[in-house]
Amino acid sequence: MAYPMQLGFQDATSPIMEELLHFHDHTLMIVFLISSLVLYIISLMLTTKLTHTSTMDAQEVETIWTILPAIILILIALPSLRILYMMDEINNPSLTVKTMGHQWYWSYEYTDYEDLSFDSYMVPTSELKPGELRLLEVDNRVVLPMEMTIRMLVSSEDVLHSWAVPSLGLKTDAIPGRLNQTTLMSTRPGLYYGQCSEICGSNHSFMPIVLEMVPLKYFEKWSASML
């Protein structure tokens, strides 16, 4: 869930997003330590009166500042590569949904069903009900079962778009003529909001995404009512 004036990530709702949060904390700690060391050295250089005008080289120091950054980069790269491979894995998805980007709305098709598709437009501010979020509500939500692996196929009918839901750790480019895929799995029920994350024209800011994650039995009732 997002909060006003929030500086950090939204609460993780998927295993991938939880991994991304851990990686963010891990990397941020390394950056903080490096920044503290650099600021400390700069402050020493600005305040000390001692100089080493006769020092021409220092093999030990050069060896240390070559090996140490390499080790730090490895410590950052390994968990990053692990998460990248996890995001690409698609193991026996229970459901496949194809989403197409348009100027400026999304269309969805549940490919496992014979005729289950719809367009999803932003609800204008003048038509919002009490409690609904401005610029984030849609007329047709994407209803999906929770705790199940879902494959999303993402493409575009016109220009570049990007289908992104931050709390699920999702961001997939929608490219005309190309079909990208990603997986999602929500560990909790609820409404999860996203937006087009690639500038696609004058109404780019008005392409919200709303996922409604529900238990399987409620999803089955919804899908039956839509057919």
Curated annotation (Swiss-Prot):
It catalyses: 4 Fe(II)-[cytochrome c] + O2 + 8 H(+)(in) = 4 Fe(III)-[cytochrome c] + 2 H2O + 4 H(+)(out). Mg(2+) binds at residue 198. It is found in: Mitochondrion inner membrane. One of its GO terms (biological process) is ATP synthesis coupled electron transport. GO terms for molecular function: copper ion binding; cytochrome-c oxidase activity. It is a multi-pass membrane protein. Cu cation A1 binds at residues 161, 196, 200, 207. It comes from the Eukaryota. Its cofactor is Cu cation. Keywords: Copper, Electron transport, Magnesium, Membrane, Metal-binding, Mitochondrion, Mitochondrion inner membrane, Phosphoprotein, Respiratory chain, Translocase, Transmembrane, Transmembrane helix, Transport. Component of the cytochrome c oxidase (complex IV, CIV), a multisubunit enzyme composed of 14 subunits. The complex is composed of a catalytic core of 3 subunits MT-CO1, MT-CO2 and MT-CO3, encoded in the mitochondrial DNA, and 11 supernumerary subunits COX4I, COX5A, COX5B, COX6A, COX6B, COX6C, COX7A, COX7B, COX7C, COX8 and NDUFA4, which are encoded in the nuclear genome. Component of the cytochrome c oxidase, the last enzyme in the mitochondrial electron transport chain which drives oxidative phosphorylation. The respiratory chain contains 3 multisubunit complexes succinate dehydrogenase (complex II, CII), ubiquinol-cytochrome c oxidoreductase (cytochrome b-c1 complex, complex III, CIII) and cytochrome c oxidase (complex IV, CIV), that cooperate to transfer electrons derived from NADH and succinate to molecular oxygen, creating an electrochemical gradient over the inner membrane that drives transmembrane transport and the ATP synthase. This is Cytochrome c oxidase subunit 2. It comes from Syncerus caffer (African buffalo).
